[in-house]
């Protein structure tokens, strides 16, 4: 139900204003999820929400605007440099609206043709695994290291290698959360 509410809310937001900034779209999404689940009512027993990221690309200017809530964006340059753009600490839609300092902030990111971008959910980074008897989370550093090793590869190849690395890391352990990875190049 939450996925459908988010999808319909985003459609509503962008139908009203196709040029809405990613940070403003996330704030509207926060409100629409909270009210759509009636979590704005004092007697509400529900307290559900989501994490999200939105990217708006300006191909003419070779830039993108990114805003995320509990989701970041990795930028792999052609020279192999990996930059991590961190999203805000807030989540969307919960009964308690985000504090002012946790509101999503749009980041403008310049890119060169061929650069690759990766967005992963916390299900990817938080998955315990590894070869040790005491499993540890996949983490952000492991993604950064893998991306730097994959310099020059296509988005499809990087997506495939991320999936392989994640599955190997997870091993026989149970998956703890939904896992999403979006990989694209510009």
Regions found by a protein language model. Give the residues of each.
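Conserved subregion of the PPM/PP2C metallophosphatase catalytic domain
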Residues: 7-186
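Conserved long alpha-helical elements within nucleotide-processing catalytic cores of c-di-GMP signaling
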Residues: 1-4
């Amino acid at each position: 139900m939450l996925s459908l509410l988010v999808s319909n809310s985003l459609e509503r937001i962008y139908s009203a204003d196709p040029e809405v900034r990613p940070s403003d779209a996330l704030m509207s999404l926060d409100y629409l999820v909270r009210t759509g689940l009636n979590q704005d009512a004092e007697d509400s027993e529900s307290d559900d929400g989501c994490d999200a990221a939105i990217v708006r690309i300006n191909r003419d200017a070779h830039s993108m605007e990114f805003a995320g809530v509990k989701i970041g964006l990795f930028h792999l340059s052609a020279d192999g440099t990996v930059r991590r753009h961190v999203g805000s600490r807030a989540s969307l839609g919960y009964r308690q609206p985000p504090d002012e300092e946790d509101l999503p902030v749009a980041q403008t990111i310049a890119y060169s043709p061929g650069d690759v971008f990766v967005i992963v959910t916390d299900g990817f980074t938080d998955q315990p695994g590894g070869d040790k008897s005491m499993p540890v989370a996949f983490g952000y550093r492991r993604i950064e290291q893998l991306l730097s090793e994959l310099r020059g590869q296509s988005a499809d190849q990087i997506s495939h290698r991320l999936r392989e690395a994640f599955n190997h890391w997870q091993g026989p352990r149970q998956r703890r959360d939904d896992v999403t990875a979006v990989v694209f190049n510009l």
